[in-house]
Amino acid sequence: MAKAILKFIRVSPIKARLIAREVQGMNAEYAIASLQFTPNKAAGIISKVIASAVANAGLDPVDAVITSARVDKGPVLKRFTPRARGSASPKHKPTAHIMIEVAAATKGDK
């Protein structure tokens, strides 16, 4: 089993979790192919993390299965937008930590 972790990535953890839940338990090659056609910022990022985890394991993407896909909350970047009469409104820019674990596929997983 091998894993890849990407921290402090500028994507909403709530939106990234939706994508991570979809790929958990999938074959790595099939997951990367399906994420390629998903119109979401998090999909491209998670696809690269899956490829990194497969490379860390030293496996072929066909022989790898995603055992765990986790997205945790990172720190929130706080910025301000100028408003009328000298006031300001806060903007919250969330970050996420993405962790993908892969393992070699058994005959039942394919």
UniProtKB/Swiss-Prot annotation:
Keywords tagged on the record: Ribonucleoprotein, Ribosomal protein, RNA-binding, rRNA-binding
GO MF entry, a single one: structural constituent of ribosome
Any single GO BP term: translation
InterPro entries named among the record's database cross-references: Ribosomal_uL22, Ribosomal_uL22_bac/chlpt-type, Ribosomal_uL22_bac/org-type, Ribosomal_uL22_CS, Ribosomal_uL22_sf
One Pfam family recorded for the sequence: Ribosomal_L22
GO cellular component labels: cytosolic large ribosomal subunit
Entry's family note: Belongs to the universal ribosomal protein uL22 family.
Role played: This protein binds specifically to 23S rRNA; its binding is stimulated by other ribosomal proteins, e.g. L4, L17, and L20. It is important during the early stages of 50S assembly. It makes multiple contacts with different domains of the 23S rRNA in the assembled 50S subunit and ribosome. The globular domain of the protein is located near the polypeptide exit tunnel on the outside of the subunit, while an extended beta-hairpin is found that lines the wall of the exit tunnel in the center of the 70S ribosome.
Self-association state and partner proteins as the record states: Part of the 50S ribosomal subunit.
HAMAP family (UniProt xref): Ribosomal_uL22_B
Name this polypeptide is given: Large ribosomal subunit protein uL22
Species assigned in the record: Aliarcobacter butzleri (strain RM4018)
